[in-house]
Amino acid sequence: MDLPEGGEMGYLLPVDGDSENLYLSSIDMDELEKISLISKAKHILYLVDACYGGIAAVGSRGLEPEKTPNYIHKITRDKSRQIITAGGRDELVIEKPEWGHSAFTLNLNRGLKEGRADSNSDGVITANELGIFLEEKVTIDSDNQQTPQYGRMTSQEGEFVFIYSENTIVNQQVANNNDSKKMDL
């Protein structure tokens, strides 16, 4: 929604929501950001499979650095508030009957369940790594009609992490330390 004095206001509208009554049937993105900030959760990752979702991605993103044990420890120690949306602010979500859902959900499943988003095969999938994977694969599957957006909602330095395999650098560090304590994830 365009604001009278410039800028935009975004809403998450459920499939049964009423676009004429946004205040009662949707979630204001500013409120979602406020909830994220006051939440006691250490890591939050929003995955938004919705048309025009790009307005939600407000932070910056970077290239995926090499994931050493120290790097994994740092990004899991710090808080994170991240978001990956199915497309840009002016894009519809592409669905095909043979997929059974959207290009975003198809590739989210492939990326996490099959480990395809684990670009360096270390058994750890970061939200940034997942965002890079989804951006590439959804753009291809949607014939360039939809490009996922990803980034941080706040300036916090942490990262949401999926442990895909038991044979990860995190678990290797624990074994090398000969310590029964796991890293503080």
Short names for language-model regions:
Residues 1-185:
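Cysteine endopeptidase catalytic domains of the caspase/legumain-like
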